[in-house]
Each structure stands twice: as C-alpha cells, then as structure tokens.
C-alpha cells in the first residue's frame, strides 16, 4: 500500500446507489485511477493504454469498454471506471498507478461590482481599456451549465474566436451547437460519473437537461460575473439598477457542465470523475483561466489525498500556464473552514459591496428605523404590530422565536406584522418565519437577528425586513409601551457608496488553513454578496432573467474576470505571478480608505484569515512592480517539504525527483504571504522577488510586525537593473511571548516611489507544541 502522503487523485464518498454487477457479483462503483503526467502526446494512444490496462484486469475488450467512464488524456493521464473493491486494489498495486480512489461528490459553493473596484469604462486609460476588455482571453468555467439565450452572451462587436482555441460546442437536450457564438465559444457536458452513481436519474422526468444547458442558473450567474457582455438598464424590480457586465466583458466563455440537478433533494451535485474530465478537456481546449465555484463539505482533504480532486486537476493546469481560481467555501464565520487550499489554487473569500437596500420601518410613535430587505411590493400602511409573548393572563402558548412562530395561534398573527428574534443568520430562518406568518394570515415579518449577509426577496413579495438586536429591542420596547402598536413598512431603496461599509461576508469560510497551516488561505477577497447577474428564466425571484445571489461562488468569478484582464495584459506571466500581483496590491481597507470588518459574532476588524491579502484592487494588480513567482522546482520543493514521496512526485511532474535530506522547510515556499503556525524558537526563511516593473528600481522594506513578534529582514534594500531581475531576501522571526497564543498579524512591504508590494504576516507562538487549549 502506498504511503498516505503519496500524491493522488481525487474523489469523494460514494452514496452506494450504483448497482453495476461484476463477474463475482460484487458491487462495482466508479473509481478514479490516476497515472500522473501523461507519457504520450497523442490522446488516442493515451486512451488506448487505459483500455489495455482495464482489458488486462477484466479479461475482455468488451468488459473494458463497458467499465470505462472517462479517459483523462490531455492535461494528465488517468481514467474513471466501474470497479469492484478487489479490482481497484489490483490496479492500485501496479507500479505505474499513482493511486486509485472511489468517486465522490462536490457541491456548488453585477451592476455595482466593477465600478466599486475601480474598473469603470468611463476612464479611457485603465486596465479595462488597456486590455480591450480581455477579448483574446478564454475563461473556462466548470459549473452547472449555461443559459445561452441570456443577453449577457451576446457577441456584438466582438472579433474572431482566438486562434489558440481548440474546443467546441456539444449539442444535447434543448441545446444545439449553433447557440454558441463569438462570446460563448465552448459548451460541453460531463455526466458519466454522475449517472454511474445515480442510476435512477430519469432524464425525461428530471428538470435538468442532459446537455450544456443550465437548470439551476448557478453556472450562468458565475459566467456573467467573470465575462458577461454589457447589458444596460438591468435591475431587480427597480433595485440595484444599472448595467450588468463581467469583469472581462469581451473575454470568451467556455462552459464545462459537470454539476447536475437532483430534483428530489433540490441540489446540484458534481461527481469528482466528471469534474476531472471537465478540467482535462479545458486544458486541451486552450482556456487561459479556469474558474470553479465548487467545494467539498468539511472536513477537507489535503492535496496529497485522492479525494482532493480539484487540487490534482489544478496542478496540471497551472503547469500548463492556466490560472485556477476557486471559491473558498460558505462555511463561515467559523475558523479553519476555508476549502480549496492547494497552494497552486487562487482561493477567494467573499465581501459585501458598498451597496445596501434600506427599508423604512415607521413605528406608531413616528420613530423611523431603517431595516434591510429586498421588498419591492406596495407600501404597507399602518398595521397592527405584534411580538408573540404571554401577556401573563393566558393559557395559550406563545413564542417570539422566529423558528417557533408555528406555536402561536392564527389569531395572534392574523392581519398583523409580526416581530420575531433569532440567533441564526441563515436565510432559511427568515423564509420559515414568513411561511408561518403567511399561513396564519399575517401581513409582514420583522426579523431581529445577528448581522448577516443572506438577504433575499421573500416569496410573493411578502414584506420581510431584517434588523439587528438593538433595533429589534427598540421595536419590542415600543410594542410593550402601548396597547395598540402599529407599524408602516415602505418598499426597499438602493443606497450606494458612503456611508455603506465593506465587510467580509458572514458565510465566507475562514482560515487558518486546516490542511497545511503554513499556507495562507484564502488568498484574496472579492464582492460576493447580493450580486445581480443572469440566470435561467425559470428561477424563482428572477426579473427578466437576472437574479441576486450570494456566496463565494460569486466572489471567485470576480477574481477570474480580473485574472483574464491581467492575462491579456501580461501574456508571459505565470499563474503564480498573477496570484502574487493580485495579493500584494490588494486593499486592506475599502476603496474609500475605511477599515474592512468581518461579519460574525462579534463583528471584528478583518485579518488575513478572513480576506487573505485583502480586497482585490484590479488597477494596482496590473502594475505590481515585483512578484513572488513560482515554477515547477518550487512546487517540487513544497511537495518534498510536506512529505510527498519521491515516486509520487516523479509520476506527477513526469521526471525523476530526489528530495533533499534534510527535507526543505515549507516556510521557504515562495508565496506572497508568510504564515508561521508554531513559532517557538527563532526561524529564518527566504523569499525571492522578480522585477516586472521599471528596469532600474530600488525597493526598501517596511515592516509592521505582529504584536509580540520580532521581524528582521536582510537586506533592507533591494536593487534591480538590467542584469539583476530576481533578488532573494531573508526574514528572521522570533517571539517575545512566553505562552501559547493565538495568531497575531502584521505585514511586510517592499516600497519604491511607485509601488507598495505588501504581503501579510500571520504568526502564532506555540511554546507547547500540538496542544489544544479549551480554557
């Protein structure tokens, strides 16, 4: 059995619905057989070698072909096949096989965004116009498909398809290849892994389409944010009005549908075998950026684990110069929940915009309170207001908890606006409360809760308004102060700019990285709350095919759009250089210079575990001055440092590898961040900077040390010229703390007259190692 640190291919727990029967009657399930770097350039030869391996195992060519689910033959070598446990073990024991693992399932994790980030078309000299809006760049998206009729995929004024494109569009149910154009240049679907497990999936009864066509709207929304064309005069029933467009509005979109809608569960699910096939095809087709708003439920798997499928596919993509952008997950605000943590992936957190939807609530004492809602119905004039509680002389059951409103009798809530309190920030709490009140004949709901970022319209445009506990208590005190409390609720308004502050979203998954704590995740943050973009026309709450959605799923394509522009401007930059440019130039405040907070309980100032380097600053990222670059040798150093065995590394990279003894330190991995999770004794680490700015330049170091941490940099000045383009420096770090601490944060900046190249410092002192303190 190979080491648990062996480099492997990804999959996840199979749900056991597959009933394929092998020779001995044992249950067969889809397994992914990972063979590492492909040994031949001819994809047909690679696939034939996969069939031969299966033929040798199963005994006949027919069985080999019927067992095969996918052949991975472009970016790497491997295949997915239906195998019994014993068959999988026989393959795993072959020397040419890196690993075999069962298939598994992943889940799916803008009118204002781009102006907010400074990418306005009104400025003739900016990144957007300097790159012709990304016209020669191809953004590949692995998601739930595409709704090709949406206006955001119009190709008005767009030139010929880029010459490096090798892909195409595949016809299927309710989708023909003719629906592609010079904007939507690719559309494929991958369902074999899904069908092998969900054999009961009935295409005639399912709401999904066995084609690239989107059912859920998620993929269409993501594609809009990354590279949608201009569509003017869009709003949601009058809210958030403006022009919808993507970050790179002339970039080309290639959709790879690998996520499928399960009607009985009302969810999208994505087979790891299908995800890998989609990534493999995208590498072959010639995409420049790969965007995946897909994640796996916690706990996560290291990139050395077979189940970390996206990490494995992403590694091969990055080696081919393709930047891979992934959502960080929606499991916040708890710490150590960030996903997609492989160090070659650009992992994205979600923030709010400088936009809100204040909703006037007027009490009977004329006090005005501004709640938050997406209420676009008519004004609800002064109406009875109630908080269900026992007045002291009743045997009835009362509850003012939003989750328990069903305990109240109908006459308690009928014809009234109901105030309730909840500790939850999840939208399901609001929707449940609305359902209870509507069934009882109520006319509206005011929900008092912790601050959250899950604002959505309520069904049938029912008045449902969120307030915090302080304002909720003000309303409750008013109710208790009078015998006939009343309230008026007016439609929501759109407020843009100051005084609306930027926050890291409550749901956005947080660091530190639970897999490899020395690798900072997330890398960067971008708007992902209440983003208005295209969807399918059958979606609830859509207005003319546009909808508000929130999630790191929306933040990731924002970064993908920025990456597309940077790729158009700097064709020779590696994925690591692009990541560095984005991270080192990010705002640590909002665009107006105000501090960024992180939603949670309690709300706090954001730190690198909330937003990585900060909020993306596209204009600055275009001219970073210096970058922390990475190449194959750096990735090999990283793999050696975290314990990959040499055989696995060799198979992965396609050439012999020998790790040094002693093994290198992961702290020397040339990331645009420094994270030390277990500082006890003094450590010295190395970073290397590459000049991508002015040929003759001088940079001086500026250090903001974490509290109680001593940081020394040598040398303090870096000189670049025509012969010196790469310079290394050493960072010596020690602690003055005498106890185990939490993380403290600082920064290290290299500055000249034009650039500030900043990386976050995150340091935790651990005098007693591997110790968990619950005091």
UniProtKB/Swiss-Prot annotation:
Broad class of enzyme this protein falls into: hydrolase
UniProt-annotated catalytic positions: 143 (charge relay system), 218 (charge relay system), 553 (charge relay system)
Secretion signal, residue range per the UniProt entry: 1-26
The keyword Cytoplasm appears for this protein: no
Enzyme Commission number, as recorded: 3.4.21.-
Pfam families: fn3_6, Inhibitor_I9, PA, Peptidase_S8
Propeptide regions on this chain: 27-109
Principal location class: secreted
Ranges of residues in domain Peptidase S8: 113-622
GO molecular function, one term: serine-type endopeptidase activity
GO CC list: cytosol; extracellular region
Ranges where the PA domain occurs: 384-476
Domain Inhibitor I9: residue ranges: 30-108
Residue positions the entry lists as glycosylated: 129, 174, 202, 395, 410, 538, 645, 721, 756
One GO term (biological process): proteolysis
Domain of life: Eukaryota
Keywords on record: Autocatalytic cleavage, Glycoprotein, Hydrolase, Protease, Secreted, Serine protease, Signal, Zymogen
Compartmental location: Secreted
SUPFAM superfamilies associated with the record: Subtilisin-like (SSF52743)
Similarity annotation: Belongs to the peptidase S8 family.
Protein name: Subtilisin-like protease SBT3.8
Source organism of this protein record: Arabidopsis thaliana
């Amino acid at each position: 059995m190979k080491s648990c640190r062996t480099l492997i291919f990804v999959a996840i727990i199979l749900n056991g619905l597959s009933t394929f029967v092998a020779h001995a009657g044992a249950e067969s399930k889809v397994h992914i057989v990972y063979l590492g770097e492909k040994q031949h350039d001819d994809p047909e030869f690679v696939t034939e070698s996969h069939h031969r391996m299966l033929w040798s195992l199963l005994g006949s060519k027919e069985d080999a072909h019927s067992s095969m689910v996918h052949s991975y033959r472009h970016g790497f070598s491997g295949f997915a096949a239906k195998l019994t446990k014993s068959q999988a073990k026989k393959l795993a024991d072959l020397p040419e096989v890196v690993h075999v693992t069962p298939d598994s399932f992943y889940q799916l994790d803008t009118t204002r965004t781009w102006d907010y980030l400074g990418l306005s078309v009104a400025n003739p000299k900016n990144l957007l116009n300097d790159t012709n809006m990304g016209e020669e760049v191809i953004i590949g998206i692995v998601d739930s498909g595409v709704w090709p009729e949406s206006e955001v995929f119009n190709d008005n004024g767009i030139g010929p398809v880029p010459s490096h494109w090798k892909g195409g569009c595949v016809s299927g149910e309710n989708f023909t290849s003719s629906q592609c154009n010079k904007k939507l240049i690719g559309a494929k679907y991958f369902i074999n892994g899904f069908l092998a497990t969900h054999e009961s999936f009935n295409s005639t009864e399912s709401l999904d389409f066995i084609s690239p066509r989107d059912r859920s709207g998620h993929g269409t929304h993501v594609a809009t944010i990354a590279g949608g064309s201009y569509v003017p005069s869009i709003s949601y029933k009058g809210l958030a009005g403006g022009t919808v467009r993507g970050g790179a509005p002339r970039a080309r979109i290639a959709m790879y549908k690998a996520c499928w809608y399960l009607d009985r569960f009302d969810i999208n699910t994505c087979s790891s075998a299908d995800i890998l096939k989609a990534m493999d095809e995208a590498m072959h087709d010639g995409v420049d950026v790969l965007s995946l708003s897909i994640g796996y439920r916690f706990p996560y798997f290291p990139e050395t684990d077979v189940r970390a499928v996206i990490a494995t596919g992403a590694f091969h993509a990055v080696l081919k110069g393709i930047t891979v952008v992934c959502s960080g997950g929606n499991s916040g605000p708890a710490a150590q929940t960030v996903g997609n943590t492989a160090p070659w992936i650009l992992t994205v957190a979600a923030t709010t915009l400088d936009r809100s939807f204040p909703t006037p609530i007027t009490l009977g004492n004329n006090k005005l309170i501004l709640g938050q809602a997406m209420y676009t119905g008519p004004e609800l004039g002064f109406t009875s207001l109630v908080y269900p509680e026992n007045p002291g002389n009743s045997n009835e059951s009362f509850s003012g908890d939003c989750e328990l409103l069903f305990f109240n009798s109908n006459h308690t809530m009928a014809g009234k606006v109901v105030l309730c309190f909840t500790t939850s920030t999840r939208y399901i709490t609001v929707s449940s409360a609305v359902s209870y009140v509507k069934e009882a004949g109520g006319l509206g709901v005011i929900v008092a809760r912790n601050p959250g970022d899950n604002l959505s319209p309520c069904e049938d445009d029912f008045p449902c308004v969120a307030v915090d506990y302080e304002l909720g208590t003000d309303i409750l005190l008013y109710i208790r102060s009078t015998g006939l409390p009343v309230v008026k609720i007016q439609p929501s308004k759109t407020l843009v700019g100051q005084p609306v502050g930027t926050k890291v979203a409550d749901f956005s998954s947080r660091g530190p990285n639970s897999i490899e704590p020395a690798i900072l995740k997330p890398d960067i943050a971008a708007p992902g709350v209440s983003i208005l973009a295209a969807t399918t026309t059958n979606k609830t709450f859509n207005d003319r095919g546009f909808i508000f959605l929130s999630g790191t799923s929306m933040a990731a394509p924002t970064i993908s759009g920025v990456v597309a522009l940077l790729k158009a401007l700097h064709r020779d930059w590696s994925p690591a250089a692009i990541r560095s440019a984005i991270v080192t130039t990010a705002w640590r405040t909002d665009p107006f210079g105000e501090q960024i907070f992180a939603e949670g309980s309690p709300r706090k100032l954001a730190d690198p575990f909330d937003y990585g380097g900060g909020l993306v600053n596209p204009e600055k990222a275009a001219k970073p001055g210096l970058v922390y670059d990475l190449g194959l040798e750096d990735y090999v150093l990283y793999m050696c440092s975290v314990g990959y065995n040499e055989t696995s590394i060799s198979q992965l990279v396609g050439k012999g590898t020998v790790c040094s003894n002693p093994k290198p330190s992961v702290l020397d991995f040339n990331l645009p961040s420094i994270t030390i999770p277990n500082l006890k004794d003094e450590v010295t680490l190395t970073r290397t900077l590459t000049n991508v700015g002015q040929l003759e330049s001088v940079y001086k170091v500026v250090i903001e040390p974490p509290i109680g941490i001593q940081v020394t940099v040598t040398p303090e000045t870096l000189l670049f010229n025509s012969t010196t383009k790469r310079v290394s420096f050493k960072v010596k770090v020690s602690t003055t703390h005498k106890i185990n601490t939490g993380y403290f944060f600082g920064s290290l900046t290299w500055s000249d007259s034009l650039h500030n190249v900043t990386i976050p410092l995150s340091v935790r002192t651990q005098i007693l190692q591997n110790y968990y303190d619950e005091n």
